[in-house]
Every structure is written in C-alpha cells, then in structure tokens.
C-alpha cells in the first residue's frame, strides 16, 4: 500500500531523518517583529535568540492553520492509500484540533495526538513510519500509536531560566534563586503536559551527566532501538559529553543528535538539552 506519514515542524526531526524516512512536515508559525514566519523555513532558533538579545522580546508561536492542513491532505490523500499525521500535544497547541477538522473531509487521512513535543513527538512519527513500512493497516497503526504515546519519555535540562521567565513560566524570584544557587531544573513532559522535575545543582556539565544517569542509568525497561539527544544550541563538546554518557549507560542501536526547533527554543532558550526515548510495553 502507498502511504505518507506527515507531521508538524515541532517534531524536531533532522533533515537527514526526514529524507531517509520520507516524512512530510507542515511548519508552525512564529510571530516576530510584526511578521508571520514559518518555523524552520523563514525563521530558525538562532534568529529568535538574536532577536531577544537585541531587546526585541520573546516571539509568539502559532499553530498550523486549517487551510494549510486541508491543502496538504488534499494533495497527499489523492496520491496515497492512507495518510497518517502526527501532531504536537493537544495541551501545547491547537494543531491537533485543526488537523482533525481538516481530516474530516478525507476517508483515508488519520490524525494522532503525540501527547508530546520536540523529538518525543518525533519518536512517535518514526514509529508510525516503521509500522506503515511493515505493512500494518492504518487503523492498527493509529491504535498502536495511541498506546505508544504513554511510553515516550521526554525531558530536558535547562542551563538558564531567563526565557522561561519571559514566557511567564517562572517568577523573577525563582530566576534569581536559580542563578544564585546554580540550579538547573529538569523539564518533563507527562500526560501531554510540561512540568518541572528534579532540580540539579552545580556546573552544567556535572548536572548534565547526573540528569542523563537519573533518566536512563540502571534501567532494563527501555526500548533500545533509538534515543534522541536534542539541544537548543550548545557547544559541540557539551553535546559530545551527553553522547558519551548515553553510550556508557545503555547500548542504544542509534543515537540521534538533533537541534530543537523554534517551539522548544523559544520556550526554554539556548543552553537546553534533553534525552528522549521509549519505554518497553508492559508484558
């Protein structure tokens, strides 16, 4: 059967992975300086950082609109036996509602809420492609993905909280305390929502190693097919330290290093990195 897996740009999959697995993306929008820009096409995270550093304020992100979805589904549904679109969590954006509305006019278009963001969302996209390539029927894929979303573990550790403060996600007092005490909070996605997990103290590299160890060390319940290390713009040596730490702790078949897109970057700012993976299904 001919199929097409599609997603929103918030999945943060690299161009190489998109090409390898023939994933089609629709960009979210970033409103900056009175202009509406397409995530990953007209604007990139470094543009946002430069804009904020210049005193321009934090840009706002906006969902893929209904017309964009209708246009893509019209094209792809005619070319394929089925299309499966995976969205960023309903709790982060109205992409899912818009995609569902657009898909209602097509018998062979299916929409799935990833219940995640960034490469937590991306992991669901790649699993959808793997299932479709294996010959599963679209109804079976959708059911399998809905079960899978509860097993994706996505988290990030932040080196700085100024972007969280600008976005109204932490207070000035919290920011001051974190800076004084050298606290690096872990942001976790649970049940489709973002929350604060453990707080680490010390140098960023020390906290990074401890964070990764806490997440994947001494565990036998992880699917080892793939892990993502996703960051919002960090020095190569810091990213490599994360890779080496993961390699020491778990024998993943594939370690994918990716840059976070505009959504995560505008929420968390530079100096953010996470490990994202899937738990095994319970027996």
Locate each region found by the language model.
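Mixed-charge interfacial surface used for oligomerization/domain docking
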Residues: 4, 10-24, 28-31, 82, ...
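Glycine-rich phosphate- or other oxyanion-binding loops that anchor nucleotides, phosphorylated ligands
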Residues: 55-57, 63-90, 97-98, 142, ...
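Short beta->alpha junction loops
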Residues: 63, 114-115
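N-terminal glycine-rich anion-binding loop in soluble enzyme alpha/beta folds
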Residues: 4-65
């Amino acid at each position: 059967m001919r199929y097409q897996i599609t997603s929103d740009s918030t999945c943060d999959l690299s161009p190489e992975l998109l090409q390898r697995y023939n994933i089609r993306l629709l960009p979210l929008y970033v409103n900056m300086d009175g202009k509406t820009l397409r995530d990953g096409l007209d604007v990139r995270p470094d543009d946002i950082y430069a804009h904020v550093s210049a005193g321009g304020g934090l840009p706002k992100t906006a969902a893929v609109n209904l017309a964009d979805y209708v246009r893509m589904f019209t094209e792809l549904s005619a070319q394929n036996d089925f299309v499966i679109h995976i969205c960023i969590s309903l709790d982060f954006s109205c992409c899912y509602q818009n995609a569902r509305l657009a898909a209602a006019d097509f018998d062979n278009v299916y929409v799935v809420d990833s219940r995640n963001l960034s490469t937590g969302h991306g992991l669901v996209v790649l699993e959808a492609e793997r299932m479709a390539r294996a010959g599963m029927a679209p109804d079976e894929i959708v059911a399998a993905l809905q079960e899978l979303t509860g097993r994706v573990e996505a988290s990030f550790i932040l080196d700085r909280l100024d972007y969280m403060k600008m976005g109204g996600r932490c207070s000035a007092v919290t920011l001051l305390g974190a800076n004084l005490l050298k606290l690096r909070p872990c942001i976790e996605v649970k049940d489709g929502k973002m929350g604060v997990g453990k707080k680490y103290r010390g140098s960023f590299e020390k906290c990074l190693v401890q964070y990764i160890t806490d997440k994947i060390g001494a565990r036998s319940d992880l699917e080892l097919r793939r892990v993502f290390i996703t960051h919002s713009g960090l020095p190569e040596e810091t990213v490599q330290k994360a890779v080496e730490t993961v390699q020491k702790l778990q024998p993943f078949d594939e370690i994918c290093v990716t840059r976070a897109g505009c959504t995560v970057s505008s929420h968390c700012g530079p100096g953010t990195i996470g490990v994202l993976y899937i738990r095994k299904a319970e027996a």
